[in-house]
């Protein structure tokens, strides 16, 4: 506490160092999330191969869509790391300016990076907090409210994803799932019947496993 009950402001150098530490911590969180999603993706690939052997094209398509969503999520996480690196570089520049000018300066580079980072759900809470602190310190200007409110952008699977689904299925199954089909609706050869009861039980187990896998991937992406 300072005079008249006011909180003593931290020295600019201490603020910059604290921000840098928080950014590095969030980068480690993002790295872990990327690894988790990629590990889960390997399991999905194995499931696609198994489903392809049984001629379950519908299951393969569902899993391929999950892989597309996961790869998009990983791409966004890598982009967020690049933005965080930009902020870290900006913090180094602030320390250099501080030594010469004795105060922190506005940075358009940091501003742009932070505007992107506050939209990433995985790190949004920390980035919003950092943005407010940086605004207060005068490094960035006040961000528009819609920047904060546009975080809920759930992407739908677009028609153009069909080609990506085909490509993934062809790649994972080494061409076994059709010969580079033009549409995912192409039928596969029917598997040979081997007992109705056993097949029904297997299908139920596979559906449960598929739902569990989708749930794990959705949790990792959220």
From Swiss-Prot:
Positions of post-translational Phosphoserine modification: 200
Principal place of residence: cytoplasm
Cleavable signal peptide: none
Coiled coil: 22-54, 141-222
Region of interest (Intramolecular interaction with C-terminus), ranges: 2-113
Residue segments, region Interaction with STAMBP: 196-222, 203-207, 221-222
Residues spanned by motif MIT-interacting motif: 201-211
Record site feature (Important for autoinhibitory function), residues: 48
InterPro entries the record matches: Snf7_fam (IPR005024)
Gene3D superfamilies given in the database record: 6.10.140.1230
Region described as Interaction with VPS4A: 151-222
UniProt site positions, description: Interaction with STAMBP: 216
Region (Intramolecular interaction with N-terminus) location: 151-220
Superkingdom of origin: Eukaryota
Comp. bias intervals (Acidic residues): 200-210
One annotated GO biological process: mitotic metaphase chromosome alignment
Short name of one Pfam family: Snf7
UniProt entry tagged with the keyword ATP-binding: no
Family to which the UniProt record says this protein belongs: Belongs to the SNF7 family.
Record's comment describing the protein's domains: The acidic C-terminus and the basic N-termminus are thought to render the protein in a closed, soluble and inactive conformation through an autoinhibitory intramolecular interaction. The open and active conformation, which enables membrane binding and oligomerization, is achieved by interaction with other cellular binding partners, probably including other ESCRT components.
Role description: Probable core component of the endosomal sorting required for transport complex III (ESCRT-III) which is involved in multivesicular bodies (MVBs) formation and sorting of endosomal cargo proteins into MVBs. MVBs contain intraluminal vesicles (ILVs) that are generated by invagination and scission from the limiting membrane of the endosome and mostly are delivered to lysosomes enabling degradation of membrane proteins, such as stimulated growth factor receptors, lysosomal enzymes and lipids. The MVB pathway appears to require the sequential function of ESCRT-O, -I,-II and -III complexes.
Subunit and partners: Probable core component of the endosomal sorting required for transport complex III (ESCRT-III). ESCRT-III components are thought to multimerize to form a flat lattice on the perimeter membrane of the endosome. Several assembly forms of ESCRT-III may exist that interact and act sequentially. Forms a metastable monomer in solution; its core structure (without part of the putative autoinhibitory C-terminal acidic region) oligomerizes into a flat lattice via two different dimerization interfaces.
Protein's UniProt name: Charged multivesicular body protein 3
The species this protein was found in: Pongo abelii
């Amino acid at each position: 506490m300072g005079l008249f009950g006011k909180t003593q402001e931290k020295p600019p150098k201490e603020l910059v160092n604290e921000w840098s530490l928080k950014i590095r911590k969030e980068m480690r969180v993002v790295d872990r999330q990327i690894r988790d999603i990629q590990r889960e993706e390997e399991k999905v690939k194995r499931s696609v191969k198994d489903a392809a052997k049984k001629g379950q094209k519908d299951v393969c398509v569902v899993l391929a869509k999950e892989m597309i969503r996961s790869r998009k999520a990983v791409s966004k996480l890598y982009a967020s790391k690049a933005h965080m690196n930009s902020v870290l570089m900006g913090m180094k520049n602030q320390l250099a300016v501080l030594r010469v000018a004795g105060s922190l300066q506005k940075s358009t580079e940091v501003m742009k990076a932070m505007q992107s980072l506050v939209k990433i759900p995985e790190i949004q809470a920390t980035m919003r907090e950092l943005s407010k602190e940086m605004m207060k310190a005068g490094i960035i200007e006040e961000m528009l409210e819609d920047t904060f409110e546009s975080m809920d952008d759930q992407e739908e699977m677009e028609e153009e994803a069909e080609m990506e689904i085909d490509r993934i299925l062809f790649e994972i199954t080494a061409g076994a799932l059709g010969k580079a089909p033009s549409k995912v609706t192409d039928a596969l050869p029917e598997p040979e019947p081997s007992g109705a009861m056993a097949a029904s039980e297997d299908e139920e187990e596979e559906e449960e496993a598929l739902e569990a896998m989708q749930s794990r991937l959705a949790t990792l992406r959220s």
